[in-house]
From Swiss-Prot:
Family: Belongs to the MsrA Met sulfoxide reductase family.
Protein name: Peptide methionine sulfoxide reductase MsrA
Class of the enzyme per the UniProt entry, highest EC level: oxidoreductase
GO molecular function per UniProt: L-methionine-(S)-S-oxide reductase activity; peptide-methionine (S)-S-oxide reductase activity
Matches recorded under InterPro entries: Met_Sox_Rdtase_MsrA_dom (IPR002569), Met_Sox_Rdtase_MsrA_sf (IPR036509), MsrA_MetSO_reductase (IPR050162)
């Protein structure tokens, strides 16, 4: 079962009176690795949000790909605006840790991004990734276009068949369009593993290749 924010509210996990704020958290609007802006209108570029566990390792995964212009760690899919890391980790906001990926679709295809996403975590684990347990670690794809949504949904069906063959259970990844609001995480979490090369990274895939041919 995919746990939506509505379900979290029903279970009493989101307390809008105690968390969130009306103003964005302070942000150093410069990517620590490539110097590009973290927050911009990004004309001519495409945006997508991926959640695949702890955003420290997930962000590094994507900024290393040719054609990715910028990345940012943040929170999305919850019930309150501008949460903090501490609030998200408490389970009271319903947000997932996600990475905003800004990419040039003439250099890297959405299919390549999807393959990286599926192969780099276990999308069958529900509210956890490995030793990281909590609603914030759930697997999500938040799409900014209907084309992304169609491609992501198709890729999930294809990868589910491949996982079935390998003995895995049902994919729990939630795919949404339109994408919910993205709230930038605190500066200390942006490009964390570039600032702390020996820092924690809990990413781990299933070992099952995602052989999709979507031409997107």
């Amino acid at each position: 079962m995919v746990m939506t924010i509505e379900a979290l509210k029903h279970l009493g996990r989101v307390d809008e009176s105690r968390v969130g704020r009306t103003e964005p958290l302070p942000l150093d609007n410069r990517h620590y690795v490539n110097g590009h802006p973290l927050c911009d209108s990004f004309p001519g570029l495409a945006l997508i949000q991926f959640g695949l566990g702890c955003f420290w390792g997930a962000e590094r995964l994507f900024w290393q790909l040719p054609g990715v212009f910028s990345t940012a760690a943040g929170y999305a899919g919850g019930g309150v605006p501008y949460p903090t890391y501490r609030e998200v980790c408490s389970g009271e906001t319903g947000h997932a840790e996600v990475v905003l990926v800004v990419y040039d679709h003439t250099v890297i295809s959405f299919e390549q991004l999807l393959q990286t996403f599926w192969e780099s975590h276990d999308p069958t684990q529900g509210m956890r990734q490995g030793n990281d347990i909590g609603t914030q670690y759930r697997s999500v794809i938040h799409c900014t276009t209907s084309e992304q949504y169609a491609a992501a949904s198709a890729s999930r069906e294809v990868y589910q068949q491949q996982l079935n063959t390998a003995g895995y259970t049902a994919i729990t990844t939630e795919i949404l369009h339109p994408a919910p609001p993205f709230y930038y995480a605190e500066n200390e979490h942006q490009q964390y593993l570039a600032k702390h090369p020996n820092g924690y990274c809990g990413l781990g895939g299933t070992g099952v290749t995602c052989a999709i041919r979507l031409q997107v």
